[in-house]
Amino acid sequence: MRAAASMNSLARKIGVANPHQFALHFDALTGMNTQSSGKWRSSFNGEKALSTQQLQLLSRIDPEVFKRHEMGPANLWQAMWAPLQGLRSILSTELALWPTLEVLVAEFEGDLLLAEAYHEPLTIAHLAKAVALHRLVHELNARIIPVGIDGEGTYRAIRRCLDDTSVAAALASLGIFDDVDAELSDWLAGHEELASTPAAARWNALASRLDWIA
């Protein structure tokens, strides 16, 4: 996933549409001959990881490529795979805004429910935050110390983001929708009922936690 997202993101950045065009642009910039060898094709397809050497070469196009490759689009890789302490930066605005994790989780879910009600599109950033909150709540409860939050709504939040057409299109444009959907669907396995809870039921569940719900 990392390779496909990085390569497709770079292709978009320089305005090319496929691995062949990318190689031609890269070769013109660097004086190398990667087009004839098909050097980048398998990474575009997500079949082969990018090596450190390849990332160093790609940094000639985008100096931020190492960071983007590690963090992912809208910090999605960090949300999915970083240690728990790495999740704070994804949620820094929300952690500063809300007094407790319970309120933060409720406010985030409320925002998603409002977007759903008004047919507003979601983004990969919404998905990354949903994943980060899900991990934070459930891993704290399971591994460190119970935080007194059931986290039921986080299953639906992830599913809602994955099912959003704008999120799906954005992930597909990077060549990673199928892989991201498959991995996160595995996270939801066994909790499909929670992931598909009707919106009205979640509004009712949040009513006692959010004073703006009439």
Residue ranges and their predicted role:
Residues L50, V147-G151, I176:
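Helix-start/N-cap signature of alpha-helical segments
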